[in-house]
Amino acid sequence: MFDPETLRTFIAVAETGSFSKAAERLCKTTATISYRIKLLEENTGVALFFRTTRSVTLTAAGEHLLCQARDWLGWLESMPSELQQVNDGVERQVNIVINNLLYNPQAVARLLAWLNERYPFTQFHISRQIYMGVWDSLLYEGFSLAIGVTGTEALANTFSLDPLGSVQWRFVMAADHPLANVEEPLTEAQLRRFPAVNIEDSARTLTKRVAWRLPGQKEIIVPDMETKIAAHLAGVGIGFLPKSLCQSMLDNQQLVSRVIPTMRPPSPLSLAWRKFGSGKAVEDIVTLFTQRRPEISGFLEIFGNPRS
């Protein structure tokens, strides 16, 4: 009933409002077009067009069918290529989770453009997670690959890792903050008087990592790095920021960096993917990162001088 030729004929008549114009578009005779529409209406048992001497217009049923017919025809026409892609070992869907520290909208768009050109029938799902939330997505939510898991050792032996680099940290506050000119190192008693601004770990199953905060100190939780930086600039609170993200603000004296009793060590981050069952799209992403290709350079900017 809904073979490709019938769908093309129905769509052409609906879009042109004329059997003769549809015939011209499809290089068929008007009689052929009219017969196919008549047969379609007989098979469905409903009138799809109102006919006049000058034009044909869709009935309510015809309007509904038109909405569906375009999708069906597109699906039928793409199916041979989709089947070939599956046969070649290409995934139907790839879920990618990205660490909040490495998340860069332009870098994500560039990677997706590269992938979509090569794998037009693969569905790509991008998620942004924080700290152990990245591992959580890999271990418990079926994600295929992670850009920026914490550490350089896998939490399960079913994953492979490639170290990407280490994030260097600076303890910062606004230039006009009351602690900005106090003698270093700042004491815990001095620090405890002011709120710590943090981004909460997004892990749902794994134990959340606790960001920097002293016992008894007020904590302000914000949703992302952009808000955390803005909060520090506004003098809302104190805390650690990646050096590469705050260096320009330190240079122009919007922020100041101070020494505290326990400085945050560098945070190593890695690419992680499943050892078994990965398809060609994931393999290509891994190659982009292991070869440090330009297509993924935006994800590595936070490291300053990423491994070459």
Curated annotation (Swiss-Prot):
Keyword line: Activator, DNA-binding, Transcription, Transcription regulation
Gene3D superfamilies attached to this UniProt entry: 3.40.190.290, Winged helix-like DNA-binding domain superfamily/Winged helix DNA-binding domain (1.10.10.10)
Pfam families in the cross-refs: HTH_1, LysR_substrate
Segments forming domain HTH lysR-type: 2-59
GO MF annotations, alphabetized: DNA binding; DNA-binding transcription factor activity
Record InterPro entries: LTTR, LysR_subst-bd, Tscrpt_reg_HTH_LysR, WH-like_DNA-bd_sf, WH_DNA-bd_sf
Annotated region of DNA binding: 19-38
Family: Belongs to the LysR transcriptional regulatory family.
Function: Positive regulator essential for the expression of allD operon. Binds to the allD promoter.
Name this polypeptide is given: HTH-type transcriptional activator AllS
Organism, as annotated: Escherichia coli O1:K1 / APEC
